């Protein structure tokens, strides 16, 4: 399964023409450059190296910010806290293990996951390691916490919920695992009364944080097509919670809005993405799998 996931991700990232139309030899014409008047001027405030990068590994380590601090990680296990205004290093911690998921932040905790399925939780104030815990498989997305629990989604489509103070497992959910999936997992949304996660099956599920009981579940997209490639409908982007509405998007499927309280579908449209949607000015924005931007 891991080999299939890795092969599929390489093909998708490289823009392989095997899946694109009837004429494999047809060259894709570059889009015409359009002159435009810039309305916003962007000035770089600072730039700081935070490690050696991901090299050739197919991972996406993203920094996260809380207040006046930015937290970042590199594949070699270096975790760095920076002043958001100046870029000055506040602390650095070296874990000496390959980090593949992160950086997550919640309630004073900085969290990362590793290629071997370890989860490390650090104190956001000084970078000291509070605890580490083992989950079922490699972690590719950022762990999330509400201060009481830490939620970790692993590449085998399982989700572990750990005690935020000790790292002990409280409960686990085993998601339906399709034969093929895009290499990646959804980040969870964690509140005081709900854990919201998307899965490779195209399902969006709301859990009770206390015991893992399912509050509701809805399928954002149904697999269609003859081949396993055509039937992939992974939710790999973090669901977006805006008030009482949840927005999410699948790969090769749909973007939609559902009720936070019931999971009832409010609307959906054809779309395809493995990134989280964004919200602004009364619209939902999706970065499409074919390098397009859609607004709904």
Where are these predicted regions, by residue range?
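Sec-dependent signal peptide recognition
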Residues: 2-9
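C-terminal motif of bacterial Sec signal peptides marking the signal peptidase cleavage site
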Residues: 14-15
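Extracytoplasmic beta-rich repeat domains
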Residues: 24, 39-62, 91-106, 129-146, ...
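Structural signature of WD-repeat beta-propellers
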Residues: 74, 114, 154-155, 199-200, ...
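Beta-propeller domains
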Residues: 74-86
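WD40 beta-propeller blade core
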Residues: 80, 120, 160, 205, ...
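Short loop/turn segments that connect beta-strands within beta-propeller blades
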Residues: 83-86, 123-126, 163-167, 209-211, ...
């Amino acid at each position: 399964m891991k080999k299939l996931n890795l092969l599929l991700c390489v093909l998708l990232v490289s823009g392989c023409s095997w899946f694109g139309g009837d004429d494999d030899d047809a060259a894709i014409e570059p889009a015409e450059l359009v002159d435009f008047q810039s309305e916003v001027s962007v000035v770089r405030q600072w730039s700081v190296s935070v490690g050696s990068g991901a090299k050739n590994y197919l991972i996406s380590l993203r920094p996260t910010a809380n207040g006046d601090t930015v937290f970042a990680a590199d594949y070699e296990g270096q975790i760095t806290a920076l002043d958001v205004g100046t870029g000055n290093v506040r602390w650095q911690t070296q874990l000496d293990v390959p980090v593949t998921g992160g950086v997550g932040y919640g309630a004073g905790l900085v969290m990362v996951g590793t290629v071997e399925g370890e989860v490390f939780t650090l104190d956001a104030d000084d970078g000291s390691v509070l605890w580490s815990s083992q989950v079922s498989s490699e972690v590719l997305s950022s762990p999330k916490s509400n201060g009481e629990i830490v939620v970790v989604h692993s590449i085998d489509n399982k989700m572990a919920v750990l005690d935020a103070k000790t790292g002990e497992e409280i409960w686990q959910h085993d998601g339906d695992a399709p034969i093929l999936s895009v290499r990646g997992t959804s980040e969870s949304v964690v509140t005081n009364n709900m854990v919201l996660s998307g899965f490779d099956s195209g399902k969006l599920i709301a859990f009770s944080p206390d015991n893992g009981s399912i509050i509701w579940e809805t399928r954002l997209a149904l697999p269609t097509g003859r081949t396993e490639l055509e039937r992939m409908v992974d939710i790999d982007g973090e669901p977006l919670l805006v008030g009482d509405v949840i927005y999410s998007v699948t790969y090769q499927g749909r973007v939609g809005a559902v009720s936070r309280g019931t999971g009832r579908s409010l609307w959906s449209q054809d779309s395809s993405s493995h990134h989280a949607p964004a919200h602004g000015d009364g619209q939902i924005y999706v970065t499409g799998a074919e390098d397009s931007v859609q607004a709904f």
